[in-house]
Regions:
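Catalytic metal-binding acidic patch
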Residues: 29-69, 78-85
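Hydrophobic alpha-helical packing segments in soluble, helical-rich domains
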Residues: 163-198
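Helical scaffold of the NTase/Pol beta-like nucleotidyltransferase catalytic core
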Residues: 1-30, 60-62, 255-260
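Terminal (often C-terminal) interaction modules
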Residues: 221-260
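Conserved NTP/Mg2+-binding pocket subregion across the NTase superfamily
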Residues: 67-172, 179
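Amphipathic alpha-helical interaction surfaces
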Residues: 185-188, 192, 210, 250-253
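A generic structural motif
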Residues: 2, 53-57, 186-189
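Short, charged amphipathic alpha-helical segments flanked by flexible coils
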Residues: 193-222
Length: 260
């Protein structure tokens, strides 16, 4: 795994803190996302991890783990973390259940003790995508190899999660989620291969008509660079999304035979 020194330090702190808080009940800690896929960008990427535990967290453990995430995240890179127990993986359920979710978007909410103690009532479709990346490309910082832990996600559930992601992207304004994520969904559903935002954007660029390429070209340049702001014309973005939507409508379901 090619990671900046600061990201490695954050991962070491997360692993050390989880070991201290959970002891032998920490089964594994797995890196997924851009670090695992080799497209981490220090200007905009998060440190994505899944912590696997032997059982659901007790109340005092929830406070300790959230405090750890609050201390480590955004110093300097944001942390995106799910805590899942073994019981959440077997039997398979969709959307996948989980015990705790942290991201910088949840930082303020998790300063409230009641929010820390609240057990999630619904699953998270995004976890199906995270499990797929982790199984196929993830890095185990602690615990068994990823493909020994995470079973193959049923194709129908993977497709549903990808299509939900596309729908969510409609209202996203950022380069990552408003342009490159829809391209990644298109590439993943068409090729049935693992794609990052970067590879999805490149794949889409080779298949788009010339008039729809500029938003993707600008997004890829920014994504690969220092996070330079990109001016996106919303009308151009909506035309891009409409084209991808038409392509997705003609794409066979993942449960059907794939491309030869």
């Amino acid at each position: 795994m090619n990671a900046p020194a600061e990201a490695r330090r954050q991962l070491d702190e997360l692993l050390g803190g989880l070991r201290e808080s959970l002891g032998v009940d920490l089964v594994g800690l797995y890196v997924h996302g851009s670090l695992a896929l080799g497209c981490f960008n220090a200007a905009r990427s998060d440190v994505d991890v899944i912590a696997l535990t032997a059982r659901a967290l007790a109340d005092d453990e929830r406070f300790a783990v959230v405090d750890l995430f609050l201390r480590v995240s955004a110093r300097p890179y944001g942390a995106e973390a799910h805590v899942v127990a073994r019981e959440h993986l077997r039997p398979w359920r969709y959307p996948p259940p989980y015990d705790l979710h942290y991201s910088e978007a949840h930082r303020e909410r998790l300063l409230d003790p009641d929010a820390v103690l609240a057990r999630p009532q619904d699953g998270d479709p995004d976890l199906a995508l995270h499990y797929d990346v982790t199984r196929r490309a993830g890095v185990a910082l602690h615990g068994p190899p990823p493909d020994d832990v995470f079973r193959e996600v049923p194709r129908a559930d993977l497709e549903d999660a990808l299509r939900r992601d596309f729908e969510w992207c409609r209202s996203a304004k950022s380069v990552l989620y408003g342009v490159l994520s829809p391209c990644r969904v298109w590439a993943a559903l068409t090729t049935r291969e693992l794609h990052s935002k970067a590879t999805g954007g490149e794949w889409a660029l080779a298949r788009l008509p010339p008039e729809l390429r500029p938003p993707v070209e600008r997004a890829l340049t920014s994504y690969a660079g220092a996070g330079e702001p990109v001016e996106l014309d919303e009308a151009d973005r909506q035309r891009l999304l409409a084209h991808i939507e038409r392509a997705l409508a003609a794409t066979p379901a993942m449960s059907q035979p794939g491309p030869a």
